[in-house]
Curated annotation (Swiss-Prot):
The keyword Secreted applies. It is found in: Secreted; Fimbrium. It comes from Erwinia pyrifoliae. Belongs to the HrpA type 2 family. GO terms for cellular component: extracellular region; pilus. This is Hrp pili protein HrpA. Major structure protein of the hrp pilus, which is a component of the type III secretion system (T3SS, Hrp secretion system) required for effector protein delivery, parasitism, and pathogenicity. The hrp pilus functions as a conduit for protein delivery into the host cell. It comes from the Bacteria.
Amino acid sequence: MSGLLTSASSSASKTLESAMGQSLTESANAQASKMKMDTQNSILDGKMDSASKSLNSGHNAAKAIQF
């Protein structure tokens, strides 16, 4: 009986260890993907901000021209 209990305990430990490892890997992959997406969004926000400033500057320059 003791050998059966030890075997079951060892099997359960291996199962939990595997599940924790998979969970940790999935979490790390998700965090890495989020970091990449946040960086890309930040870059795009900067480009959009620059484009908006450029358009506003052109619009303001056009308004300043007096005929």
